[in-house]
Amino acid sequence: MGDVLISDRPPSPARLSHTSEKHPRVTLTELNVLRRHRELCDVVINVSGRKIFAHRVILSACSPYFRAMFTGELEESRQTEVTIRDIDENAMELLIDFCYTSHIVVEESNVQTLLPAACLLQLAEIQDICCEFLKRQLDPTNCLGIRAFADTHSCRELLRIADKFTQHNFQEVMESEEFLLLPVGQLVDIICSDELNVRSEEQVFNAVMAWLKYNVAERRQHLAQVLQHVRMPLLSPKFLVGTVGSDLLVRSDEACRDLVDEAKNYLLLPQERPLMQGPRTRPRKPTRRGEVLFAVGGWCSGDAIASVERFDPETADWKMVAPMSKRRCGVGVAVLNDLLYAVGGHDGQSYLNSIERYDPQTNQWSCDVAPTTSCRTSVGVAVLDGFLYAVGGQDGVQCLNHVERYDPKENKWSKVAPMTTRRLGVAVAVLGGYLYAIGGSDGQCPLNTVERYDPRQNKWCAVSPMSTRRKHLGCAVFNNFIYAVGGRDDCMELSSAERYNPHTNSWSPIVAMTSRRSGVGLAVVNGQLYAVGGFDGTAYLKTIEVYDPETNQWRLCGCMNYRRLGGGVGVMRAPQTENYMW
């Protein structure tokens, strides 16, 4: 026999690791065969007289409910036949089949019995499958039923999804029979949500009244309980008075009349609105509209004008709204507490100290605001810390450095520290808690100087000047910079523009506008910077242009109805009613 070759390396043990992928499937299949043949079964589940043979160990491995039953001290742990009540026998058989096969079919005919059974047996996977099935079945005609079903069986995720679906599709849901059959508690749960997707609060009121009139005899006792969740202060005045206030059911209930009176006070007392805020004055999120731009007064065709128009960027339309009671050129405009203030100006003959206030909810101007202590045109107006500031201007005799501020709570103006320089045609802006007065004219020549007011110290101090002298310029705060555009220097109308960085106390140029614009309005609307109207040295302008900071470019984007020089601009959120009166 030949020699046997022996390696010098130490021997390694022979080993092969194997995990069978077929084994679990084969084992379950064979266990199910045993069950079908009633072999080695040690328990019978009796549901409504139907006897289902099974193995305790399989049921316990799959269901915490059965595990607690068979491994604890319950009487069922010693029984060979266990009766389970309040569960559908077909659903139980499907679930026990699943324990042996890992397969189940959920369909419209069984989901309503399968989900409660899965909840009882604590089969989380089947609960999830049933909920997923119901999510896919959601539509405006059944979402309320599915929502109630989910709530009954504590299916939080399905309840959340059904709620979200109901809120998003409320305009269709309110037309369904399910809606008319809602218990009062579920109705309140739905209409109290901030997420309710409606075009206006009028739709919510109409839905509530349709629900009420479906069964007036039983439901009229709940009218006040339900109406307190309708946000009546957000209704249009016409609808509030003509529809809500005249409804016989509403008029016959004292608590409902109080809700209507509350809404009327909110609409009729705009200055008091900051003190009247609450759940009923909060707009629902889906109905919150974007910002709109107002162009107020100005000079056109050789005379001051009273006209006012507003621009909606979503539609790119300019529409006329109620005019002011007086013609005003060189008017100062600002928004305080969702109301638009027009301060001073010149009516073509006289310098003005009167103020008008516009309420977009009613499309009306009111003249009950206290006048400024001085007549002012070419005045700068801005809001800081809840006060309205009037800065500089001219009174027909001299250029002013006077500054005063308006307290809407007291309806009173009071003087604060004057500027260090007299300024007419001044632009003002608020940034970082300071009030900036930018450029203008001292009565002799245009200015490039800038000063800012600290309300904590009641003091003005100079900051870095602009690179260009500018009077009758436009300015606005955009992305934490102060932008100054257009105006007029010693010689001509300007198209140039620059911006101020408060962190470096420096000005830097940006690209010029497409047109020269003196007496231009500048405002930020929905995150975009708009330059409005003005005078180019030859003609009064009705064009507007918008600035893109990413490309550092201006582009024209439409025209106003009126040409405007020295008009004011203000930005407000559009009213929350479908039938607002613009």
Swiss-Prot record:
GO terms for molecular function: actin binding. Residues 1-22 are annotated as: Disordered. GO terms for biological process: negative regulation of synaptic assembly at neuromuscular junction; protein ubiquitination. Residues 143-245 form the BACK domain. Kelch repeats lie at residues 292-338, 340-386, 387-433, 435-480, 482-527, 528-574. It comes from the Eukaryota. Keywords: Actin-binding, Kelch repeat, Repeat, Ubl conjugation pathway. Pathway: Protein modification; protein ubiquitination. Coiled coil: none annotated. CDD domains: BACK_KLHL20, BTB_POZ_KLHL20_KLEIP. Residues 41-108 form the BTB domain. Probable substrate-specific adapter of an E3 ubiquitin-protein ligase complex which mediates the ubiquitination and subsequent proteasomal degradation of target proteins. May have a role in synapse differentiation and growth. PANTHER family: KELCH PROTEIN (PTHR24412), KELCH-LIKE PROTEIN 20 (PTHR24412:SF451). This is Kelch-like protein diablo. It comes from Culex quinquefasciatus (Southern house mosquito). The gene is dbo.
